[in-house]
Swiss-Prot record:
PROSITE patterns hit by this protein: MANNITOL_DHGENASE
GO BP, sorted A to Z: mannitol catabolic process
Catalytic activity: D-mannitol 1-phosphate + NAD(+) = beta-D-fructose 6-phosphate + NADH + H(+)
Binding-site list for NAD(+): A3, L4, H5, F6, G7, A8, G9, N10, I11, G12, R13, G14
One GO cellular component term: cytosol
UniProt-recorded name of the protein: Mannitol-1-phosphate 5-dehydrogenase
Record has Cytoplasm as a keyword: no
Length: 382
C-alpha cells in the first residue's frame, strides 16, 4: 500500500505520517519546505519524541519526500492508494490543483483501483471542503469518473504537538503528546476499508467532531481565559489551580450532558474521556501558553464555536450551564497586545457595554437570562 501525505510539518511528521509509516505503508511526504524535503530524502527517517507519563523516542523510517508544487507529486497521486493532508485549513485550496491534475492523469492511465483522500485538519468536514476545491480545478469531463473512483473521506483529528522542547536544530525532530485520535467517516470510502492502527472508523463522525469541540476545545479555552485572569502563564499552571479546575471540569460536564442527550454517549465513558482531557492539560511537557490558547476570542465566542455552541445545547435541552457561563464571562475579559481580536473585543465592550457586545458576538438575545448571567459574572471579575 502506498500513501502520499501533504504537509511535512510537525503534525504531518508527528501524527498522521507516523501512523501511516508505522502501519507499514510506503509513505512519501509532499511539502514546499526544501530544507525538510532534503533532510527526509537524505535520511529517509526521523525521530519523534512522545511525551507523557513515560517519555519515549520513536524512529519513523522508510519515508521519502517530493515538492508539493512539482510534477512528481502529480505522478504520485496517479499511483498511490491513500492521500492525506495536514497543511492547515487555508492551504487546502492551494494543493487542490495538483490533486486535480493527478486524478486526471489517473483516469487517463485507465487506473480503476480506488483512491481515498483524507484531509486531517483542525476543522469540520475538511475533506468535503477540499473536494470542492479539487472539483473547481477539474475539467468537466473528468468529474463523473472522479466521483465514481475517488473517496473523499472526512475525519476528526486530535493530538497536541507543542514546540520542540529539546535543544536541537534537527529540522525533522518533533515532539508529540502520548494521546492521539484520528476518526474517519467510514461511509465515504471507495473500495475496501483500510486497516491502519490508530485510525478509528465511524458512521457517525459529527458526534466525535462535537465531542472534541465540546470537551477538549471548550475546556482548553476556559482554562486559558480563567488562567489569564488569575495570572497563570501556562495551561498546566492554570488547571492545577483548584478553583479553575472545578469550573473547567464543571463546564465539560455541562457540555457533556448535551452530548449524552444528543448522541446517546455512554455517561461513564464520557466521564472517563473528560478525565483524560484534564490529564492532557496537566502534561508538564506541553508548555502551552494561556495567551496562545486564548487568542481569537471573537471567533471562540461565536455561535458555532467552543463556548456558545455547547451553551445553546444546554438551553435546547433545559440543562445546567453555570460553569459554561463563567467561562464565557472570562473570555470577555481576555486582553492581549499581540491579538487583534482581543483588542477588537475590548473596544466593542467599551463602546457598547458587555450586554450588547456579547449579544452581537455570540448571536444570543441581549434580553435573555443567560446574557444577564454572563454580564453579572463579567462585572464580578472587574
Amino acid at each position: 500500500m502506498k500513501a502520499l501525505h501533504f504537509g511535512a510539518g510537525n503534525i504531518g511528521r508527528g501524527f498522521i505520517g507516523k501512523l501511516l509509516a508505522d502501519a507499514g505503508i510506503e509513505l512519501t511526504f509532499a511539502d514546499v519546505n526544501q530544507t525538510v524535503l532534503d533532510a527526509l530524502n537524505a535520511r529517509h527517517s526521523y525521530q519523534v519524541h512522545v511525551v507523557g507519563e513515560n517519555e519515549q523516542v520513536d524512529t519513523v523510517s522508510g519515508v521519502n519526500a517530493v515538492s508539493s508544487i512539482g510534477d512528481e507529486v502529480v505522478d504520485l497521486i496517479a499511483e498511490v492508494d491513500v492521500v492525506t493532508t495536514a497543511v492547515g485549513p487555508v492551504a487546502l485550496e492551494r494543493i487542490a490543483p495538483a490533486i486535480a491534475k493527478g486524478l486526471a492523469q489517473r483516469k487517463a492511465q485507465g487506473t480503476e483501483r480506488p483512491l481515498n483522500i483524507i484531509a486531517c485538519e483542525n476543522m469540520v468536514r475538511g475533506t468535503t471542503q477540499l473536494k470542492g476545491h479539487v472539483f473547481n480545478a477539474l475539467a468537466e469531463e473528468d468529474k463523473a469518473w472522479v466521483e465514481a473512483h475517488i473517496g473523499f473521506v472526512d475525519s476528526a483529528v486530535d493530538r497536541i504537538v507543542p514546540p520542540s522542547a529539546s535543544a536541537t536544530h534537527d529540522p525533522l525532530e518533533v515532539t508529540v503528546e502520548t494521546f492521539s485520535e484520528w476518526i474517519v467517516d467510514k461511509t465515504q470510502f471507495k473500495g475496501a476499508l483500510p486497516t491502519i492502527p490508530g485510525m478509528e472508523l465511524t458512521d457517525n463522525l459529527m458526534a466525535f467532531v462535537e465531542r472534541k469541540l465540546f470537551t477538549l476545545n471548550t475546556g482548553h479555552a476556559i482554562t486559558a481565559y480563567l488562567g489569564k485572569l488569575a495570572g497563570h502563564q501556562t495551561i498546566r499552571d492554570a488547571i492545577l489551580d483548584k478553583k479553575i479546575r472545578a469550573v473547567v471540569q464543571g463546564a465539560m460536564e455541562e457540555s457533556g450532558a448535551v452530548l449524552i442527550k444528543r448522541y446517546a454517549f455512554d455517561p461513564q465513558k464520557h466521564a472517563a474521556y473528560i478525565q483524560k482531557i484534564l490529564g492532557r492539560f496537566e502534561n508538564p511537557y506541553l508548555k502551552d501558553d494561556v495567551e496562545r490558547v486564548g487568542r481569537q476570542p471573537l471567533r471562540k465566542l461565536s455561535a458555532g464555536d467552543r463556548l456558545i455552541k455547547p451553551l445553546l445545547g444546554t438551553l435546547e435541552y433545559g440543562l445546567p450551564h453555570r460553569n459554561l457561563v463563567k467561562g464565557i464571562a472570562a473570555a470577555m475579559h481576555f486582553r492581549s497586545e499581540d491579538d487583534p481580536q482581543a483588542q477588537e473585543l475590548a473596544a466593542l465592550i467599551a463602546d457598547k457595554g458587555p450586554q450588547a457586545a456579547l449579544a452581537q458576538i455570540s448571536g444570543l438575545d441581549a434580553a435573555s437570562d443567560v446574557v444577564a448571567e454572563a454580564v453579572n459574572d463579567y462585572n464580578a471579575e472587574k
